[in-house]
């Protein structure tokens, strides 16, 4: 229980050797770092409410409902857009960061994924490979920590906010097949 709270709340208090964890336990810890904690706190991660909103979207879609509800409450579409964007962007950054590290570093994939999830979630836990990463690997971890502390949506807005304003003025309404 203590280790799961440490992973979710970015305490970074490491009392066990995560490098010695078996794969299922490592994956559970990675998931907890990925999700994070409540949006009202300072913990990193994607946030529990974002994951909950995405699950509500999937549940409503599978039941062919047009309104997205959770525990009998309708979730505003604007919040759903933010949650979906955050989920996709956060997952993409973890995937890209892990891919980049696996391309330049010679460690087990799950250890690299753990380091990336910890860095982006600003958790502070490690499987023990951080010190053995090369200069470029450490730079990737530093960039991920910066993005995680800044927030993935804030980072995304910094990259694409100006472009979005001009695109919205030019965009025509259309429908696509999904």
List each language-model region with its residue ranges.
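Membrane-proximal intracellular helices of multi-pass ion channels
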Residues: 1-178
């Amino acid at each position: 229980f203590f280790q799961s709270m440490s992973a979710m709340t970015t305490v970074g208090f490491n009392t066990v050797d995560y490098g010695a964890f078996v794969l299922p336990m490592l994956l559970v810890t990675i998931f907890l770092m990925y999700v994070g904690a409540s949006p009202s706190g300072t913990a990193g991660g994607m946030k529990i409410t974002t994951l909950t909103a995405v699950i509500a979207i999937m549940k409503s879609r599978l039941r062919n409902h047009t309104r997205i509800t959770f525990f009998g409450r309708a979730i505003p579409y604007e919040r759903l857009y933010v949650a979906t964007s955050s989920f996709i962007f956060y997952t993409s950054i973890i995937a890209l960061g892990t891919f980049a590290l696996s391309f330049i570093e010679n460690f087990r994939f799950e250890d690299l994924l753990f380091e990336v999830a910890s860095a982006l979630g600003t958790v502070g836990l490690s499987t023990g490979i951080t010190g053995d990463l090369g200069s470029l690997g450490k730079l990737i971890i530093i960039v991920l920590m910066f993005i995680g502390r800044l927030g993935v949506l804030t980072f995304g807005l910094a990259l694409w906010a100006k472009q979005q304003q001009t695109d919205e003025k030019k965009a025509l309404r259309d429908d696509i097949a999904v």
